[in-house]
Amino acid sequence: TGWTTVYRDEGQTVYLSDDGSVYVPPADPEPVTPPEPYVPTLAELQASKKQEISTACEQAIYSGVSVTLADGSTEHFALTEHDQLNLFGKQAQLTAGVNQLEYHSDGQPCRYYSAADMTTIITKAMWHVSYHTTYCNALNMWIVGCESAEEVQQIFYGADVPEQYQSEVLKAYLVKIAAMAGDDVKDAQTA
């Protein structure tokens, strides 16, 4: 006895109370305003873009170069840091007067290369690494020169670097690349 107050009525189930209390549903929560999305600072965007460019540069270098050898065959050589160190060692062997040098192209067994072929491989590899390093440096200078997030976001690996951010070295590389492209066009026209 004493359970005479309807505490809560859920349709088929009725709860009673013995102290006269009545169920009061909790108040609806206040709507939660979603937080504003985080907007990185210009310095944070620049740091992130530099990391993106650095990674792309490393991938471009590591992908390596294809080299046409004296016999007319073309072989591809990856240029990871380990590969680059090996090639510097081969350069020392060349300086010492070695005429046949053991090395291997991607996915191939080790074989002997003539001093002339090894010189060609090393020259192309060093050019490839130096160009990409120089290009990456110019992109980083461009990133630092940006004054807005929009400017930073427009930069990507492979973009034409504005002249004001091109070093003397990059300009020389670009002239050489244009000349090589011109030679390819001439070769294609005469073929």
What are these regions (language model features)?
Residues 2, 7-191:
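A preference for well-ordered globular domain cores
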